[in-house]
Every structure is written in C-alpha cells, then in structure tokens.
C-alpha cells in the first residue's frame, strides 16, 4: 500500500506535515492541506490502522438515469446480502475524478472489495491509473461489463460482440439490407464490440459494410440525434440497432416526430432488456442482458477474490437473448414482394 512517505513526496511536504493532515491536525495551511489530500486521493492512501473484516463492498455505477445500472446494482445487493456482504452504492456520474474520490472513500471505509459496473475502464480515452494502482496494492475488484485485457482483473458481463451480431442476424433474417447502428460514443469499448459483431454478421451474409453508423451520447436525446443523422444519409436505413434501450426509446420518439411508422417504415432493436421496453409504443424488440446471472457471478467472483486473492479468477461472459416484440418487421420492399 502507498505509505505516508509516498504521500509526502507526491505533495512536496515533510512526512510530519503529511502525518498532521492524515490525523486531522488543524495546524496546517489550507493550501498545503489541499496538496496533501490530493496526493492521498491520487495514491489511494489509507491510514495504516488495523481493521477487522467489515463485510462491506463498494458497487460503483456510471449513472442512475439508465435503468439497467440500478437493476444491476440491486441484483448484486440482493445476492451479496445472504453472503454477509453489505453494499455501498456509488454513482460516479461517468466522471473519472468522482470515481477516484469514491474509491478513496470506500478504501477509507474498509471495504473488502469493489464491483465496478460499466466503469471508466470502458472509456478507452479515460483515466485508468487508479485501476492500475488498485491492482498493484492488491485490492479485490471485479469489472461488470467493463472487459479489459490490460489489467489482471476478473470481468463479468454480457458478450457485447454477440449482442451486435445477434441483432444484425435477426434483422437480416427479416429481409433488411440497410441496417444502421445508433451507437454510443466511439471511444467506448462496448460500442466498438457491438459494431464488430454487426460487421461480422453483415460479412457472413455476404453484405458489405455500409457505414450506416451514427455516434452519440448515451441517452434519449443521443438516440434521437443519431437517428436524425442516419435519416439524412443518401440511402437511409430501414432498420437500426441501438447501443441501449434508452437510446432506442429516443429513436422511437424521433421517428414518431418525423411521421415514421415503427415498424412499417423503420425497425428498431434496443439493447439491455430494461422493464420500460415492455411499455414503449410500440413495445421494443431488444437484446436482453442476463442481469441475474451477471450479478450472481460478479458477487461469487468477488467473494472468492476476498477469500483467495492469489487464485486464478477467470472472466465470465454470457450470451444475450433476443426478445422479439412489436418494433421490428420485414422492410416495405419485402412485404410488397410477398403480397404480389
């Protein structure tokens, strides 16, 4: 673990000054205190005091507005409680500095491990240094839907590549040949994996990549903006796959605003399987994450890490499920040909 001497060196102060800050001594100038506290956060410094097993784990989510994240957090909490583990939920609002602050707070509380859901690790342009320090310090952490090959951290989640492939295969089976992708930000790993799955399915069907992809922020407005962009293309799509159900609901809204009928004019497929998809108009076809399986395996993996940190803890990826509802149909040209 980082020592007080490391903190002092980072902050450019004496060990005695760093010690006074760590012990809450008020006899330190405010600007000096701020430098030392910043160094503590950056180094994930925790005072070297003996702790008993706390039974606490941290669960960090990027936001609460998208229902899939509270659903995953709740499923984790439900499975952790019978094992004697109490969850502390932290909403990072997709901000690296906030995630780092929460990590420091959780370590200070003596958590036995942490589960990061769709964390900053999925942002390929993001700040990853705190994960590297956590691994170096032997912290017990598990990524959920945050796959990485760069750190020795077990990852549990849905197979994002399979999700993109499954959605594309289904739309091809309906007769669609112009299949757009309403994507999240390009520099996020889940976006790239879904895009790769889509490309694989197109190639397997003998269809060339048509680059009908529009990148936008995750969320309702992002989905609407991405669809608007795709519809302005010279040869717009007859179907779209969305990075999330929330983006897909934004697509439904934008389609209705433009007077398009879903699915007669445009088929829409979401991703996640949130409860709201059963109540959208029309009901949304979606690629569903196995949330309960993911939560069970994440808690099990973390508990094994806590008990046996030196053992091998492999990654676990689950194949998603296609839920066909009312937002998808054959394209108009196929329907006309079939009725002729």
Question: What does each of the following model-derived ranges do?
Answer:
Residues 1, 40-74, 83, 93-94, ...:
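N-terminal helix-turn-helix/winged-helix DNA-binding helices
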Residues 1-54, 335-340:
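N-terminal helix-turn-helix DNA-binding module of bacterial transcription factors
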Residues 4, 228, 232-340:
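Flexible loop/turn connectors
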Residues 31, 61-71, 89-98, 120-124, ...:
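Hinge/beta->alpha junction and helix N-cap segments in small-molecule ligand-binding domains
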Residues 98-111, 223-235:
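Short, well-structured alpha-helical segments in soluble
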Residues 100-111, 115-162:
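Short beta-strand-centered segments that line the small-molecule binding cleft or hinge
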Residues 177-178, 209-212, 262-267:
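Short acidic capping loops at alpha-helix termini that bridge into adjacent secondary structure
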């Amino acid at each position: 673990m980082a020592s007080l001497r490391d903190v002092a060196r980072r902050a450019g102060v004496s060990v005695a000054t760093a010690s006074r800050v760590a012990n809450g001594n008020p006899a330190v100038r405010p600007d000096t205190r701020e430098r030392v506290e910043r160094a503590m956060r950056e180094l994930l410094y925790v005072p070297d005091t003996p702790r008993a097993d706390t039974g606490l784990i941290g669960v960090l989510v990027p936001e609460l507005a998208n229902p899939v994240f509270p659903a995953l957090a709740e499923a984790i909490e439900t499975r952790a409680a019978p094992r004697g583990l109490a969850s502390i939920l932290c909403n990072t609002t997709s901000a690296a500095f906030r995630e780092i602050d929460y990590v420091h707070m959780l370590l200070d509380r003596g958590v036995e491990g942490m589960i990061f859901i769709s964390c900053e690790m999925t942002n390929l342009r993001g700040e990853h240094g705190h994960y590297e320090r956590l691994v170096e310090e032997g912290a017990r952490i598990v990524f959920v839907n945050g796959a990485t090959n760069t750190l020795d951290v077990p990852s549990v989640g849905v197979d994002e590549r399979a999700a993109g492939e499954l959605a594309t295969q289904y739309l091809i089976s309906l007769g669609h040949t112009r299949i757009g992708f309403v994507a999240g930000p390009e520099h996020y790993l889940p976006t790239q994996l879904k895009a790769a799955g889509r490309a694989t399915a197109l190639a397997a069907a003998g269809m060339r990549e048509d680059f009908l992809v529009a990148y936008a922020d995750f969320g309702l407005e992002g989905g609407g903006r991405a669809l608007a962009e795709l519809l302005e293309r010279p040869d717009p799509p007859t179907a779209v796959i969305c990075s999330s159900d929330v983006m897909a609901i934004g697509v439904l809204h934008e389609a209705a605003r433009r007077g398009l009928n879903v699915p007669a004019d445009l088929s829409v497929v979401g991703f996640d399987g949130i409860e709201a998809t059963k109540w959208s108009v029309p009901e949304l076809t979606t690629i569903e994450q196995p949330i309960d399986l993911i939560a069970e395996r994440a808690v099990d993996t973390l508990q094994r890490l806590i008990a046996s940190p030196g053992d091998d803890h492999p990654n676990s990826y689950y194949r998603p499920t296609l839920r066909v509802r009312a937002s998808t149909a054959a394209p108009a040209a196929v329907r006309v040909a079939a009725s002729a």
